[in-house]
Structure formats: structure tokens, C-alpha cells
Regions:
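Cleavable N-terminal export/targeting peptides
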Residues: 1-34
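Short loop/turn motifs that connect adjacent beta-strands in outer-membrane beta-barrel proteins
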Residues: 25-34, 69-84, 96-100, 115-121, ...
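Outer-membrane beta-barrel initiation region
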Residues: 27-76
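Residues that define the transmembrane beta-barrel architecture of outer-membrane proteins
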Residues: 33, 56-62, 81, 102-106, ...
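Transmembrane beta-strands of outer-membrane beta-barrel pores
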Residues: 41-47, 68, 87-93, 114, ...
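Predominantly the C-terminal beta-signal and adjacent terminal strand-loop region
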Residues: 207, 216, 232-294
């Protein structure tokens, strides 16, 4: 699943904090529901855990969901609680499956978010990765993402640090060669972001960067490190009336270094590298995107 799902749902959930206590607790207050959508055109499909899924043609990825505000109390330690449900779809232009055509993957995810101690956020999501053409058996997983809001530190840019625990419950290995359930990896990362709007330039530049580590059986070998990734994303807020939501266009690239030899071996099994070649050590994935939230 795309890394951007976590980032976007965190941003939408954070927006719920702007509600006043009167609005949040009034008996006649309207339902506090927000939504989001992301459309990306990419030259590759590479998962956050470093699985190089597709490399020929292009891939279109669509993420959408709803965020339900459940409770908002600025005086409480846990000052905001919300619940997110959503889906992820991958459309691979070079796939021509008899039963699914170019529909390569369908995922669903759901879970609560807790904002606490003023600057911390914990997202908990259960989900499944499904293969419409039957390339793999359903993969059920549980993910915990802890992030810190460093906007109050007074730095000229935001670091946006986070750590994620991805636990594979059952089904096929999410990296092909690893254990089928009962294992995990940890993603340690940050998304340094520089906002140029104070300089009258309507752009944000971010550099999403992470590394994955975990027990060797997650990849099926003897190494405890998975993938290192870094890149640049330029985001432009589209001048669309707020009544239609908040829209952004973006472009950028993400570099991946497949540190674990099992990730490189998996490429030869999936066809993104030639059999016996040893796989690609690294890859750059370019993308264009459109997102909205309300």
C-alpha cells in the first residue's frame, strides 16, 4: 500500500482539532465527517517495505476514505479521537489479466487515531491486501504509526518524525519471500517539509525518508534491514473554492535502495528483474499526483 495514505489521513485527522469544544460536544452539532482522495500516476509500483511490484508501463494508484471525528476535548490528555476507513487501488497498464484486466491490487483499511499530549498522534489500522488477478493470497495486517508534531519547535522547516510497526497477521508474505504471518517490520522515518508560502511562493517541498528494520524472518533471510528510501515532493495548492474542498497538485520522485538481498531476489520472482540477475540494487520512482480533502 502507498505510503501517502498514512500521511494524508494524519493530516485530515489533525484538521479535526480545529473544532471548538462547543462544536464538538453540542447535541445539535452536525456530524463531524471528513473525506480524502489521492490519484497518482507513477512509473513503478514499489511498496513502503521495498517490494518492487511493477516496473514496465505505468501504474495508477487511487486512495480514498472517510475520517469520522468521535471526540474532541482540548483539556483531556487524549484531546482528539477519530476513525478512518478507506481503500487503495492499483491499476497497472501493462497487465492484461483475464479476470481483472489492469486491476492489480485492492486494499482496505480501517482504524482509530488518537491525538494526545498536545503534539503526538497514534494511528492504529487493520487492513487487507487483495489481488484481483489472484497473484497472491489475501494478506491481513495490523499497523501502528506514532508521529510527532514538531511545528512548535520554531524551526524554519518541519521534520515530521514518525515510527511505524507493521505486523503481518496472516496470508502470504508482503515481501514474497518472508514468513506468512506472525512477523513484523519497523519503519523509522521523517518527512522534512519546507513551506515557501511566507515568501509568496505557493509551494511546499518535502523529502519523505525512511528505513525499515525487523526480524530476519520478515524477509526470509538472515538480514535485519529492509529498504532505505528518500525523495522530493513538490506540492502546489490549487486555487479552487474551499466549498469544493482543498485540492493539491504534486510531483516528485522517490529513491529506493533495496538493502535486503531477499528484496532483490523477490524482483526476479515478480518479473521486475531478470531471473538469475540478482535484482536491482536501487530504483527511482517518479510520480504526478492530485489530492483533495474536505
Amino acid at each position: 500500500m502507498s505510503q501517502m495514505k498514512f500521511a494524508f489521513t494524519t493530516v485530515v485527522a489533525a484538521g479535526l482539532l480545529s473544532l471548538s469544544p462547543a462544536v464538538a460536544h453540542a447535541d445539535d452539532a452536525p456530524l463531524n465527517i471528513h473525506g480524502f482522495g489521492i490519484l497518482n500516476l507513477q512509473n513503478d509500483y514499489i511498496t513502503p517495505r521495498g517490494l518492487f511490484v511493477t516496473g514496465k508501463g505505468e501504474t495508477v494508484q487511487v486512495i480514498d476514505g472517510l475520517v469520522f471525528g468521535l471526540n474532541h476535548d482540548p483539556a483531556a490528555t487524549i484531546d482528539d479521537i477519530s476513525f478512518t476507513v478507506g481503500t487503495f487501488n492499483d491499476i497497472y497498464t501493462d497487465q492484461h489479466a483475464k479476470t481483472a484486466g489492469s486491476w492489480n491490487e485492492f486494499d482496505w483499511f480501517a482504524g482509530p487515531s488518537f491525538h494526545f499530549a498536545r503534539d503526538w498522534n497514534l494511528d492504529v489500522q487493520i487492513g487487507q491486501f487483495l489481488s484481483p488477478p489472484g497473484n497472491f493470497n489475501a494478506e491481513t495486517n495490523l499497523e501502528f504509526a506514532l508521529s510527532f508534531d514538531d511545528s512548535k519547535l520554531g524551526l524554519p522547516f518541519l521534520l515530521k518524525p514518525y515510527v511505524k510497526l507493521f505486523y503481518a497477521i496472516s496470508g502470504d508474505s508482503t515481501v514474497v519471500t518472508g514468513a506468512k504471518g506472525g512477523t513484523f517490520d519497523v519503519e523509522i522515518g521523517a518527512a522534512p517539509t519546507f513551506d515557501l508560502s511566507p515568501y509568496h511562493i505557493p509551494l511546499k517541498i518535502s523529502a519523505p525518508t525512511w528505513i525499515t528494520v525487523g526480524p530476519a524472518d520478515f524477509w526470509g533471510g538472515t538480514d535485519n534491514v529492509g529498504v532505505f528510501s528518500t525523495g522530493l515532493t513538490v506540492t502546489y495548492p490549487l486555487p479552487i473554492t474551499p466549498r469544493l474542498g482543498h485540492w493539491n497538485a504534486k510531483a516528485g520522485f522517490q529513491y529506493y535502495n533495496f538493502l535486503n538481498p531477499k528484496l532483490r531476489f523477490a524482483q526476479t520472482l515478480l518479473g521486475t528483474a531478470s531471473p538469475g540477475s540478482g535484482g536491482h540494487q536501487d530504483e527511482v520512482n517518479g510520480f504526478l499526483g492530485l489530492s483533495f480533502g474536505f
